[in-house]
Curated annotation (Swiss-Prot):
Residues 68-78 have a biased composition (Basic and acidic residues). Keywords: Cell projection, Cilium biogenesis/degradation, Cytoplasm, Cytoskeleton. It comes from Xenopus tropicalis (Western clawed frog). Residues 26-40 have a biased composition (Polar residues). Residues 15-24 have a biased composition (Basic residues). This is Intraflagellar transport protein 43 homolog. PANTHER family: INTRAFLAGELLAR TRANSPORT PROTEIN 43 HOMOLOG (PTHR33724:SF1). Residues 84-100 have a biased composition (Acidic residues). Residues 1-100 are annotated as: Disordered. One of its GO terms (biological process) is cilium assembly. Belongs to the IFT43 family.
Length: 201
């Protein structure tokens, strides 16, 4: 339902959206009726001022002149310069053809290993020989005396053990026999301690 307010306007007939010339013509008719209603002497209140401004404002002023100057500067930057001016002082780089470029086979190039001086690591045998023969190794950095250490060092054959495969039964009998002998020795010592010693008077 449409409510029509009595503001001195005739009820308008609503139809579909108007496009083209008809839409412009209806807008002009509405503006003419609005101007005519403003000019009527019997109407109360002051006339409504026409508002202009925004994007479509064509008023001239100081801000408009500065806008034009900035637009001119931007336009000159965006305009393409002529080819004659740009070619005067600059050389155009030439892209070489693929046939002119010699292919380098990177697979055949091997990087050289880094050259770092590495001290040779001595074996135990070398260390033993040097330690026993040279008295210079008996002090370390001139401050630490190694003579006591060299006196108690054992030779390598005495320290090195052979790799022997263990048999469970044999290992069990060896360990059990050693435990029994230790137990027997401990038992005998206790008995000796518990025996009353003859009192000497």
């Amino acid at each position: 339902m449409e409510d029509v307010l009595d503001l001195g306007e005739a009820p308008s007939r609503r139809s579909g959206v108007k496009m083209g010339r008809r839409a412009r013509a209806s807008q002009e008719n509405q503006q003419e009726t609005a101007d005519a209603s403003r000019n009527q002497p019997g109407r109360e209140g002051p006339p409504k001022p026409l508002r202009q401004g925004g994007w479509a404002d064509d008023s001239s002023g100081p801000s408009k002149s500065t806008k034009r100057m900035t637009e001119d500067v931007e336009d000159s930057r965006l305009k393409q310069q002529s080819l004659d001016e740009s070619d005067e002082g600059e050389d155009i780089p030439v892209i070489p053809d693929l046939e002119d470029v010699q292919e380098e086979d990177l697979a055949l190039q091997v990087a050289s290993p880094p050259s770092v001086q590495v001290n040779r690591v001595l074996t135990y045998k070398d260390l033993d020989n040097d330690l026993m023969r040279h008295a210079a190794f008996q002090t370390l950095d001139g401050d630490i005396d190694l003579k006591l250490l060299t006196k108690v060092l054992s030779p390598e054959p005495e320290v090195r053990e052979e790799n022997v495969q263990w048999d469970w039964d044999l290992l069990f009998t060896e360990v059990s026999s050693e435990l029994i002998t230790e137990w027997d020795v401990g038992k005998m010592e206790k008995e000796d301690m518990l025996k009353p010693s003859p009192l000497v008077s």
